[in-house]
């Protein structure tokens, strides 16, 4: 605002000058060119054409540009530029001097030089950037190389660990391969123990030819070589770090066995293609290694008879002796007049025999270590069985003492009860005979203490009076028979409990006498007979209803508790056999969308818990159960508590209301050592 637009005359420049004006500005007039005079040296003046040619020459030499060929599309690139307005202003101000040709040429050359410098700096900068890019790429390649090496190491370690796992799996499944038995033998040498201490059935150089009475195939040997390479030059495991010499020697033997197996396979294939008698004879000779002695050995270049002599020379030497022999032979090569072929043949055979010696020595170590380990394991097993037998005997003696104490306590309580009853009866009789009696006993009716012998009296006397209810439903026995029967029952009970504790009790066919004793034992002590877990489970599985399923072990809720009696008794987990009652809920939705051919999903309708406590210390207290909150509102924890020596056990069940009526299936009983809790859930029927 407030600025006035500048007026331009016809001779002035504008924002968008026309091409004619540009050309006019570029092409100097004759008057302007007339100012280009020669210097005082007397050289002729340069014309506009010469100046134009000079500029074209400079552009072409330094840049390769011309008026027709340049990246700018300028057809007047070589024309000198004259700034007319500037010259007019300078001339009007009296500041314009003469423009010489030398100044124009110098200005053009300086600009060309400046452009060259800029171009050179740009090229240097591009070279620096290219060099830096190469350095960055090299650094990136170095990082990738390190990463790849790390990745390769991890991959190799992964393959090794997989190989060890496959070895362990094949050993567990009794389908061990050669590499598995070799690794197992080396681990036995290092002190590891296995259930079966079996190693290679023979020396490695023999097993590589025949394994399990069959020739070792090419595929088996190739797999063995690949597995052996995984154990060379590594220290992943103990069998790798301490047996490198063995693995390298085994690789040598495996490669030789592979070559022989391939030759044997080629001979058999050739024989299969051509079964002529001559070919069969040649094949048999090659397979038996009984070719003519005049044929030279392909490996050593010596006669086979001499080769057999060399094998006899090297066969019985150890690895150290073979190393010493190799050093001596190499020193012989410096001497003159020696059979080079013979000694080179020996040198070629030494690595094979050295590998055989190393593997044979390691195999002897395997067999010896396995035998020692078996003897040690047998001795440990015998000691363990002896300790278990001692513990069982001690436990049986302890149980026998407890049972005897319990029997004596019951007998004493029974005697005291009989004495008290006799006193009551005697007092009632005395009251009936003499109403004025003061409650004291007469000499005839005074009861005697246990163990007290009554004094001899003359004439008849009254026996102790027993209540009649004691004998209403009992079997009357003679005193001697009663004592004998009680002694037999006690002995039977002690023997059965002792065998049961020791884990030696079997289930023989019950005899009539044993059945009678068991029945009498139930009468004597109903809580003494305990149903075993196996008997109960066998019976319950037979009676399993169609809508019942055995509760999964995952329903058990783990508890972490400490008990005050842990120092006296070793806590044990009770055994259980629980069932889940399932069924279909035929509500309105299910009846609409399902039928009996396509039923809805089953839902839990109840539970049946059977917890076994056969060895409770205090059998007078029945186990109890508690309901505790769970981690979800739809479930609840039911915990069973019995006391020593049993831990508490808990299960996660659905949080629904129970039916507590007996005719609805509710059962809460502790009988014969089994805590039984049966219940069903209430069913809600909604009506409009």
Swiss-Prot record:
SMART domains linked: CactinC_cactus
Family membership:
Belongs to the CACTIN family.
| Protein purpose | Plays a role in pre-mRNA splicing by facilitating excision of a subset of introns. Involved in the regulation of G1 progression and stage differentiation of tachyzoites. May play a role in gene expression.
This chain's source organism reads Toxoplasma gondii (strain ATCC 50861 / VEG)
Designated name of the protein: Splicing factor Cactin
Q: What Pfam family is a match, any one?
A: CactinC_cactus
Which segments does the entry list as coiled coil? 108-182, 248-275, 365-406
A Gene Ontology BP annotation from the UniProt entry: cell differentiation
Q: How does it assemble?
A: Homooligomer; the oligomerization requires the C-terminus.
InterPro entries on file: Cactin_C, Cactin_central
Q: Which parts of the chain span the membrane according to its record?
A: none
Q: Name one GO cellular component term.
A: cytoplasm
Q: What is the lineage of its organism?
A: Eukaryota, Sar, Alveolata, Apicomplexa, Conoidasida
Residues of the region (Disordered) are: 1-49, 431-454
Q: Where in the cell is it found?
A: Nucleus
UniProt keywords (A-Z) are: Cell cycle, Coiled coil, Differentiation, Nucleus
- Work out whether the entry's keyword set contains Nucleotide-binding: no
């Amino acid at each position: 605002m407030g600025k006035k637009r500048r007026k331009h005359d016809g001779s002035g420049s504008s924002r968008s000058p026309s091409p004619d004006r540009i050309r006019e500005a570029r092409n100097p007039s004759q008057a302007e060119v007339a100012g280009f005079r020669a210097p005082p040296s007397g050289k002729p003046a340069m014309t506009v054409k010469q100046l134009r040619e000079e500029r074209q020459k400079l552009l072409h030499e330094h840049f390769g540009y011309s008026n027709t060929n340049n990246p700018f599309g300028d057809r007047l690139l070589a024309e000198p530029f004259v700034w007319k307005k500037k010259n007019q202003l300078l001339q009007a101000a009296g500041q314009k001097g003469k423009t010489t040709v030398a100044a124009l040429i110098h200005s053009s050359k300086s600009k060309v030089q400046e452009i060259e410098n800029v171009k050179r700096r740009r090229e240097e900068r591009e070279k620096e950037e290219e060099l830096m890019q190469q350095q960055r790429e090299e650094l990136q390649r170095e990082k990738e190389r390190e990463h790849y090496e790390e990745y390769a190491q991890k991959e190799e370690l992964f393959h090794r660990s997989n190989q060890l796992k496959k070895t362990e799996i094949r050993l567990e499944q009794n389908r061990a391969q050669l590499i598995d038995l070799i690794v197992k033998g080396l681990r036995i040498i290092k002190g590891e123990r296995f259930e079966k201490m079996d190693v290679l059935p023979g020396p490695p150089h023999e097993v590589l030819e025949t394994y399990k009475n069959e020739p070792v195939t090419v595929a088996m040997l190739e797999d063995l070589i690949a597995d052996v390479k995984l154990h060379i030059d590594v220290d992943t495991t103990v069998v790798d770090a301490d047996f490198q010499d063995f693995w390298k020697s085994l690789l040598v033997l495996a490669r030789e066995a592979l070559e022989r197996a391939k030759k044997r396979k080629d001979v058999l294939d050739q024989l299969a293609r051509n079964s002529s008698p001559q070919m069969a004879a040649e094949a048999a000779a090659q397979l038996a290694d009984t070719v003519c002695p005049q044929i030279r050995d392909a490996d050593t270049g010596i006669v086979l008879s001499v080769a057999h002599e060399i094998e006899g020379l090297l066969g019985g030497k150890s690895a150290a002796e073979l190393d010493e022999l190799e050093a001596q032979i190499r020193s012989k090569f410096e001497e003159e007049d020696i059979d080079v072929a013979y000694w080179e043949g020996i040198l070629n055979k030494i690595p094979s025999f050295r590998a055989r010696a190393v593997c044979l020595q390691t195999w002897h170590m395997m067999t010896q270590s396995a035998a020692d380990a078996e003897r040690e394991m047998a001795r440990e097993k015998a000691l363990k069985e002896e300790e278990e037998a001692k513990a069982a005997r001690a436990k049986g003696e302890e149980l026998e003492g407890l049972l005897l104490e319990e029997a004596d306590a019951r007998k004493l309580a029974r005697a005291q009860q009989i004495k008290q009853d006799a006193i009551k009866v005697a007092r009632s009789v005395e009251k009936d005979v003499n109403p004025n009696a003061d409650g004291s006993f007469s000499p005839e009716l005074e009861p005697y203490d246990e163990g007290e012998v009554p004094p001899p009296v003359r004439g008849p006397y009254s026996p102790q009076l027993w209540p009649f209810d004691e004998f209403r439903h009992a079997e009357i026995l003679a005193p001697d028979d009663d004592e004998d029967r009680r002694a037999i029952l006690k002995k039977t009970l002690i023997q059965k409990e002792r065998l049961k504790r020791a884990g030696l009790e079997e289930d023989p066919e019950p005899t009539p006498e044993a059945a009678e004793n068991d029945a009498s034992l139930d009468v004597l002590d109903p809580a003494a007979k305990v149903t075993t877990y196996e008997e109960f489970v066998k019976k319950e599985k037979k009676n399993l209803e169609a809508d019942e399923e055995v509760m999964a072990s995952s329903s058990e809720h783990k508890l972490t508790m400490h008990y005050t009696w842990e120092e006296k008794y070793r806590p044990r987990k009770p055994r259980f056999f629980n069932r889940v009652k399932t069924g279909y809920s035929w509500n309105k939705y299910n009846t609409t969308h399902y039928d009996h051919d396509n039923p809805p999903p089953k839902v839990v309708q109840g539970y049946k818990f059977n917890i076994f406590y056969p060895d409770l210390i205090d059998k007078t207290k029945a186990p109890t159960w508690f309901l505790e909150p769970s981690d979800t509102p739809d479930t609840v924890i039911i915990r069973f508590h019995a006391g020593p020596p049993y831990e508490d056990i808990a299960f996660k069940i659905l949080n629904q209301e129970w039916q507590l009526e007996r005719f609805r299936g509710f059962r809460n009983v502790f009988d014969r050592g089994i805590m039984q809790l049966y219940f069903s859930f209430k069913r809600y029927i909604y009506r409009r």
